[in-house]
Structures are given as structure tokens and as C-alpha cells.
Amino acid sequence: MGERKFNVRVYGVCLLNGKVLVTDEFIKGKEITKFPGGGLEFGEGTIDGLKREFVEEAGQEVKILRHFYTTDFFVPSAFDPESQVISIYYLVEFLSEPAFPVKEKCFELADRTKDSFAFRWVPLSEIEEDDLTFPIDKRVAGLLRTM
């Protein structure tokens, strides 16, 4: 048995004009739909980590509005069964008008020979738990439906 560890993730729930932002990603040969964000780096706080993720992925800065949800059940990592995922979600908004490319359909990825991703806006009234890949994102989608 390998070393068991925690994997802390931070994600932004970005709502704009009645839609929520998701990313369609091709990672390690798998199609994944999730909320924007990613892993915390050592020495980073959750808010700074989320801001960094948005600059890296979208090329834009976000404002953190408030905490939305933190994982409250056990979830092993999809990529490392010896790792427990703890995800923290914040409601965010862009500091300027979104200027990154957005796709209309799921998995309109330019290159499937390497890890890649694309942003997509989903109407909040249409978001379903099954639209997202990971169990924690599914929980957040369910919470969004009750807003």
C-alpha cells in the first residue's frame, strides 16, 4: 500500500447572464467536464490558488465573492486511489469582461493527443449533476439547481 495523502483542490463557480462556466478537458486519455480550477500548490492559500488557476487557464483575474461549498464526504482521487480529494468551491466573478475562447458544444477540443481543455457556458436552468464528471462537482451542480 502506498502513502495515503490529501489532495486539496480549489474551484470557481462563475455565474454570468444566467449561465455557469465549466471546462471540458482531455486528461490522461479521459474526457472530463468540471468547474474551472485545480490543485493547490504547497505554501498557497485557497483564494490565492484559485486566482492563480484562473489566470493560468483563462488568462483573466477573478474576484472571490464568497465560499460556496467544501467537500463533506470521502472521495478518492480518480487518478490516485491512495489520495483523498478535498475540494473547496468559491463563487467568483471576472474583474473584466471574459475574453477567452468559449465553445458551444461539449468536448470541442482542438487536440486530443495531449492534455487539453475548452471553456463552455451552460445555462444555469439546464445544469444537471450528470453533466459533470467528478462526484464533488456533481454535488455542487445539484446545489446550483437549488439557488
Where are these regions (language model features)?
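Active-site-adjacent beta-strand/loop module that shapes the phosphate/pyrophosphate-binding cleft
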Residues: V75-E104
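A short coil-to-beta-strand element that immediately follows conserved catalytic motifs
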Residues: E61-T70
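A generic structural micro-feature
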Residues: G2-F6, I32, D80-I86, D111-S116
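Short loop segments at secondary-structure junctions
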Residues: L16-K19, F26, E93-P98, L124-E126
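Nudix hydrolase/Nudix homology domain
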Residues: K30-T33, A99-P101, K105-M147
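Internal catalytic or translocation cores that form aromatic/hydrophobic pockets or channels
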Residues: K51, T70-F73, V85
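Conserved Nudix-box catalytic region and its N-terminal flanking loop in Nudix hydrolases
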Residues: L16-E56
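Conserved N-terminal beta-strand and adjoining loop/helix that marks the start
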Residues: M1-L21, G39, L91
